[in-house]
Every structure is written in structure tokens, then in C-alpha cells.
């Protein structure tokens, strides 16, 4: 059986605005988050995403923060991944009209169980690989305050 499981202990528990601390994960629920409940849950204080032979995703699917817009922030996570490839999206946009309602695009910090994708900067649904592990990546806002 192929099982791809992503566990994010304290996912975004340490993510907060530089101006006023705001924890995004309470360690118990997915309050403030939106994702397919067939694939996302909280187990033992961790956010868990699963994609299995018995319960496969239909393409990429995401757990999306919906409880407000974050401006400047620090993000700190611990993760464990068993097979597969995943990542953390930031400064993302909703891909409307997609099959499962939880499809987004944007900048992604990749991680995986192997050694090919972990540490790369990826443009999900718009640019592909932006930089490889070890490359310096600098993202700047345009005149409208948006990432290019």
C-alpha cells in the first residue's frame, strides 16, 4: 500500500505577525483552516495530511488558512513526511473552478522524504521551480505591494 502522510507538528503554531502575535494552530482543531476533511485532520497535536491508495487525492489539494490575511510574519515548523512530496504555500492565490475547491497557486517551500525537492522554492501553478536547494532566493514586492 502506498501511503503518503505529512505530519506538521506545531504547524504555524510559531507563525505570527511581527506586530501582534497570532497563533494559527491551536494544537487541537483546524479552526480557521479550510481543507478536504477526507485528507486533513489533527492527531496528537499535529496537523496531518494523508493521501493513500484507499483514499487518494484528486490532484494537488491544500489546507488553506482562511481566518484573515497575514502581512509580515515569521514561520517556524517541524515536519515529518512519509513518502511523497509536499510543501508550505505562502502569499498564495485561490485557483477558482478547480475540482476539489482546495487548489491554490503561489510560492511554495518544498519538502519531501527524498533529497530532490526539499529546500527548493517552487511556484505552484504558475512558474515551476524558482530556485534549488542552496540557491539564494529574494522575493520583492512590486509597486502595488504584490509579489511578482
What does each model-found stretch correspond to?
Residues 1-3:
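N-terminal secretory signal peptides that target proteins for export/translocation
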Residues 5-14:
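Sec-dependent N-terminal signal peptides
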Amino acid at each position: 500500500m502506498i501511503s503518503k502522510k505529512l505530519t506538521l507538528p506545531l504547524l504555524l503554531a510559531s507563525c505570527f505577525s511581527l506586530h501582534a502575535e497570532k497563533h494559527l494552530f491551536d494544537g487541537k482543531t483546524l479552526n480557521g483552516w479550510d481543507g478536504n476533511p477526507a485528507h486533513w485532520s489533527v492527531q496528537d497535536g499535529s496537523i496531518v495530511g494523508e493521501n493513500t491508495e484507499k483514499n487518494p487525492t484528486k490532484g494537488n489539494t491544500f489546507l488553506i488558512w482562511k481566518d484573515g490575511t497575514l502581512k509580515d510574519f515569521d514561520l517556524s515548523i517541524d515536519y515529518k513526511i512519509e513518502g511523497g512530496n509536499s510543501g508550505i504555500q505562502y502569499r498564495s492565490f485561490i485557483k477558482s473552478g478547480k475540482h476539489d475547491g482546495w487548489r491554490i497557486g503561489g510560492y511554495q517551500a518544498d519538502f519531501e522524504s527524498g533529497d530532490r525537492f526539499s529546500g527548493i522554492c517552487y511556484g505552484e501553478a504558475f512558474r515551476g521551480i524558482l530556485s534549488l536547494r542552496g540557491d539564494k532566493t529574494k522575493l520583492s514586492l512590486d509597486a502595488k505591494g504584490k509579489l511578482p
